[in-house]
């Protein structure tokens, strides 16, 4: 079902990390395996064929078999990213939005308002300065490709909590940064929400696919934009790698008085 694990691995490599594609069953069988990594990414695709609901079965795998290892991973200061189906997994497993009284059923992701699979490019506007994956204030242009991408909150109180506690990471906007209806908001997400972060700023989930825009030739109009075009998607991965190097590995190196150790990232696949 997962079908963007190779692109995600490639994006991490471009950003300077060593990435391993790890089957979720290996993590379940060896729960200490996760400890050797610094970034955990749940890639996009259709895990378990989207049976029941998109991301639901893998979310149940996480809830029943990996809740403690993943929680410890986050508590240790490491990073978690969920892309498209991976975002659905993080939400349905209760990892996002996370903390401060949120219940698993307060937020979910459901079918697009159009009733169709939406495959198009969209602009995203960052909504927070605390998420380590994000460059605050800079619009990014990336593709979406999903049939169930509509973020919904249980009620107005749950939505207000997302807003007031800084959980909204990205919103869908136009080229000028303004929110709007379809196709600007491709799925009808409440408050134009395209991505969420947790209270630490080290867990990010988003419906669009940054791993599909890490080379300039992947832009739909790349030939008109010149050789200096810096792909927007790769910045998310660079920021993650930079954070690990500057915050986690340098601290470890200082404690051991040795050189900066190598780090790696893992992407689980069903």
Predicted regions located by residue number:
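C-terminal and late-domain segments of enzyme folds
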Residues: 126-253
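N-terminal beta1-alpha1 cap of cysteine-dependent amidohydrolase-like domains
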Residues: 1-83, 87-99, 110-118, 154-157, ...
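A short linear-motif detector with a strong N-terminal bias
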Residues: 18-21, 37, 59-60, 100-105, ...
